[in-house]
Amino acid sequence: MKIYERFGTREIVEAINRVGNAKFENITDYNKKYGFTDITLIAELFEGIGVLLEQNLIDIKMADKLFGPTLNLLWVRMKSVLYAMREGLNEPFFFSHYEYLINRLNLYRESNN
Protein backbone atom coordinates (compact mmCIF):
# COMPACT_ATOMS: atom_id res chain seq x y z
CA MET A 1 0.00 0.00 0.00
CA LYS A 2 3.04 2.29 0.23
CA ILE A 3 2.97 2.60 -3.56
CA TYR A 4 -0.66 3.68 -3.45
CA GLU A 5 0.16 6.19 -0.71
CA ARG A 6 2.92 7.59 -2.94
CA PHE A 7 0.39 7.88 -5.78
CA GLY A 8 -1.74 10.16 -3.59
CA THR A 9 1.02 12.51 -2.45
CA ARG A 10 0.79 16.17 -3.31
CA GLU A 11 4.00 15.89 -5.37
CA ILE A 12 2.58 13.14 -7.61
CA VAL A 13 -0.91 14.65 -7.85
CA GLU A 14 0.54 18.00 -8.91
CA ALA A 15 2.84 16.28 -11.43
CA ILE A 16 -0.15 14.39 -12.86
CA ASN A 17 -2.11 17.64 -13.20
CA ARG A 18 0.79 19.41 -14.93
CA VAL A 19 1.40 16.53 -17.35
CA GLY A 20 -2.32 16.22 -18.01
CA ASN A 21 -2.55 19.90 -18.91
CA ALA A 22 0.71 20.14 -20.87
CA LYS A 23 0.49 21.45 -24.41
CA PHE A 24 3.45 20.71 -26.65
CA GLU A 25 4.44 20.01 -30.24
CA ASN A 26 7.35 17.59 -29.71
CA ILE A 27 9.91 16.48 -27.14
CA THR A 28 12.03 19.61 -27.60
CA ASP A 29 9.00 21.82 -27.03
CA TYR A 30 7.96 19.71 -24.02
CA ASN A 31 11.42 19.89 -22.46
CA LYS A 32 11.68 23.64 -23.04
CA LYS A 33 8.28 24.34 -21.47
CA TYR A 34 8.12 21.77 -18.68
CA GLY A 35 11.35 19.80 -18.28
CA PHE A 36 11.26 16.10 -17.56
CA THR A 37 10.82 16.07 -13.77
CA ASP A 38 7.06 15.48 -13.73
CA ILE A 39 7.12 12.79 -16.40
CA THR A 40 10.00 11.06 -14.64
CA LEU A 41 8.20 11.12 -11.26
CA ILE A 42 5.10 9.56 -12.77
CA ALA A 43 6.88 7.07 -15.02
CA GLU A 44 9.11 5.87 -12.16
CA LEU A 45 6.06 5.16 -10.02
CA PHE A 46 4.32 3.15 -12.74
CA GLU A 47 7.61 1.54 -13.82
CA GLY A 48 7.87 0.09 -10.31
CA ILE A 49 4.34 -1.26 -10.48
CA GLY A 50 5.16 -2.82 -13.85
CA VAL A 51 8.19 -4.58 -12.35
CA LEU A 52 6.07 -5.87 -9.47
CA LEU A 53 3.49 -7.12 -11.96
CA GLU A 54 6.12 -8.82 -14.14
CA GLN A 55 7.53 -10.56 -11.06
CA ASN A 56 4.02 -11.62 -9.95
CA LEU A 57 4.27 -9.55 -6.78
CA ILE A 58 1.12 -7.59 -7.56
CA ASP A 59 -2.07 -8.78 -9.19
CA ILE A 60 -3.29 -7.05 -12.36
CA LYS A 61 -6.78 -6.82 -10.88
CA MET A 62 -5.40 -4.97 -7.85
CA ALA A 63 -3.36 -2.62 -10.05
CA ASP A 64 -6.48 -1.86 -12.06
CA LYS A 65 -8.59 -1.22 -8.98
CA LEU A 66 -5.96 0.99 -7.31
CA PHE A 67 -4.78 3.05 -10.27
CA GLY A 68 -7.57 2.53 -12.80
CA PRO A 69 -7.95 4.78 -15.80
CA THR A 70 -5.25 7.16 -14.57
CA LEU A 71 -2.65 4.70 -15.88
CA ASN A 72 -4.02 4.82 -19.41
CA LEU A 73 -4.74 8.54 -19.47
CA LEU A 74 -1.21 9.37 -18.41
CA TRP A 75 0.32 6.84 -20.80
CA VAL A 76 -1.52 8.46 -23.71
CA ARG A 77 -0.26 11.90 -22.63
CA MET A 78 3.31 10.76 -21.96
CA LYS A 79 3.91 8.07 -24.58
CA SER A 80 5.34 10.29 -27.31
CA VAL A 81 7.73 11.97 -24.87
CA LEU A 82 8.82 8.64 -23.35
CA TYR A 83 9.43 7.15 -26.81
CA ALA A 84 11.46 10.21 -27.80
CA MET A 85 13.44 9.94 -24.56
CA ARG A 86 14.18 6.29 -25.38
CA GLU A 87 15.43 7.28 -28.79
CA GLY A 88 17.44 10.27 -27.56
CA LEU A 89 19.08 8.26 -24.79
CA ASN A 90 19.56 5.24 -27.06
CA GLU A 91 17.84 3.19 -24.36
CA PRO A 92 15.06 1.16 -26.04
CA PHE A 93 13.83 -0.23 -22.71
CA PHE A 94 13.64 3.11 -20.87
CA PHE A 95 10.47 2.91 -18.74
CA SER A 96 9.52 -0.30 -20.54
CA HIS A 97 7.89 -1.76 -17.44
CA TYR A 98 5.41 1.11 -17.44
CA GLU A 99 4.54 0.14 -21.01
CA TYR A 100 4.37 -3.52 -19.94
CA LEU A 101 1.92 -2.53 -17.20
CA ILE A 102 -0.25 -0.66 -19.71
CA ASN A 103 -0.25 -3.58 -22.16
CA ARG A 104 -1.13 -6.10 -19.45
CA LEU A 105 -3.82 -3.83 -18.08
CA ASN A 106 -5.39 -3.43 -21.52
CA LEU A 107 -5.37 -7.22 -22.07
CA TYR A 108 -6.91 -7.74 -18.63
CA ARG A 109 -9.66 -5.22 -19.33
CA GLU A 110 -10.40 -6.67 -22.77
CA SER A 111 -10.74 -10.18 -21.35
CA ASN A 112 -13.01 -9.00 -18.52
CA ASN A 113 -15.54 -7.03 -20.55
Spans of model-derived segments:
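Amphipathic alpha-helical "stem/stalk" segments
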Residues: 1-113
